[in-house]
Regions:
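Amphipathic alpha-helical hairpins/coiled-coils and adjacent low-complexity
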Residues: 1-86
């Protein structure tokens, strides 16, 4: 472990990386929203099990991306708190 300033610089770099990851996850979530909307419109009136499964799976993927975003943001808050305390 380096001096306090080195630690703070490392934490800041980690936070920057996490922020970039959140932006990427958000972009992926937006794309999934578009894909899901298109699939719903395309499959309207169809009760085919494969269409229903595809919609359900995309919804689950979207929820997990939301969870990843929330966890990442919470981690950034914790890292910022740590950085401010040292």
């Amino acid at each position: 472990m380096g001096n306090v300033e080195d630690v703070k610089v490392g934490i800041a770099a980690s936070i920057d990386g996490a922020d970039r990851a959140v932006a990427g996850i958000q972009a992926a979530a937006d794309q999934l929203d578009q894909s899901l909307a298109l699939l719903r419109v395309t499959a309207v009136g169809s009760f085919h099990p494969a269409a229903v499964a595809a919609i359900n799976q995309l919804e689950q993927a979207r929820l997990r991306l939301d969870e990843a975003i929330q966890l990442s943001r919470t981690a950034v808050e914790s890292a910022n708190m740590f950085r401010s305390m040292i």
